[in-house]
Structures are given as C-alpha cells and as structure tokens.
C-alpha cells in the first residue's frame, strides 16, 4: 500500500496527513460538522449572496462547493461531484416563462445529483419541467418551495433521503404525480403545507422520530386515504393531525 504524506487545510488550520487513520479522522470530523448543523445554519448556506465563481461548460456557476445558477444546461445535467449546496432558485424560472425558459432551462429532462449534496435551497427547482431526478441520501435540508409546481416530474413513489432532517414550507406543493411518500428515521421537522395539493397522493409514512409537523401538510390531497405511522405512536400523531385521525394507521415500516 502506498504511503500517505500530505497536508490539508480544514477550518483555517493546516493538518498533516501521514496515515489512513489521519484521513479517517478528518473525514469523520467533516461528517460530524455537517450532521451538527441546525436548520437555520443549513438554510443560511443556501441564502448567501452570489460571489465570483467558476462556470462549467454549460455556463452553470459554482463557488465554494455550491451550485449558484443553472444557465444553459442541455437535456441531461449532472451537478458536479463535491457540490454540497444547491443555492436558492438555482434551477428556478417563473411561471410565465414555462415553455420558453431562461437560457435553455426548459430543455432539462434529467437532473443528476451527487452524494455530497446536503442542502437544497428555497425555490431551487420551482416550476422546473424536469422529468427525472433522484434525491441522494446525503440531503439533510430541503428549503421552502424547493420542488413546488414541478408537475412534470414523473415520480410516483417519493422515498425521501435517509439523512433528511428538515423539510420547508410548501416544499412539494402541487407535485401532482406523487402517489406515495416515505420519510426516514432522521426526519425532525416537516413545515406547513409541504405536500399541499398533491392530488394523486394516496398514502404517506412518517416515523415517530419527527418532532414538529406544521399545519396542513396534506391539505388538498384529495386521494389521501392513509397516513402510516410507527407502531405505538398514535397519541403523538393525533396531536399533529387532529382533523385526520381517521387516516392514521400504525404499521411496521418493513411492510409498506
């Protein structure tokens, strides 16, 4: 096995790497720092002012491990490996530009996201007409209206990222093709109207690890028949869903 001998700057400190153990320690420190970020800190990562940065072959702008804006992507666009944040409104174009788009955005059908991604900003994909996108398990934060009005998205079963902790207001509002939603055990906060008017939605699973659920997350979901919850958590969820108690069904996650 080749020797390791080098230096890395981490949080303003120069650290020497002489062994696999040194490398593992630094990776663990990085993982811990991102896991420990609060909802507000994750949001702030996506809300910074646009700095100078590098553009890729499509003219899409990157800086500080963030994707800031998508300018002229083609049918399929792969977000650069190592990108940790998709900035607010990066893929967004307004309601009245649909079918025309801004500098080619209307042509993106497939979007590939890297496993390094931890935060998706406010309105990052709103009104986008992509057909396919998969959310990597590394994503911890999905901002307000991030996927709102993405009614061209061919997603029927939405399995949310394993590391997802925070979901913003109206994050998936009007995503009319989603039929089922599965949250994983790291989820802490689901803000209000997250799935409002997802008219094809039939059921959702939410584990008892959730600490806060805003009002009306399933308002307008006219086909919703079941809200599946963890075994033994009915009392907890009756507080979250006082008007939908009849839809609450305790179930083992392995059976959905």
Question: Which sequence ranges carry the predicted segments?
Answer:
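Short linear proline/tyrosine/threonine-rich motifs used for host-factor recruitment
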Residues: 6-9, 14-17, 33-34
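DNA-binding interface regions
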Residues: 241
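Mature extracytoplasmic/luminal segments of secretory-pathway proteins
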Residues: 15, 55-57, 147, 152, ...
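Acidic-aromatic substrate-binding/catalytic surfaces of carbohydrate-active enzymes
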Residues: 92
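Consensus positions within tandem repeat domains that build extended binding/scaffold surfaces
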Residues: 89, 121-124, 143-146, 168-171, ...
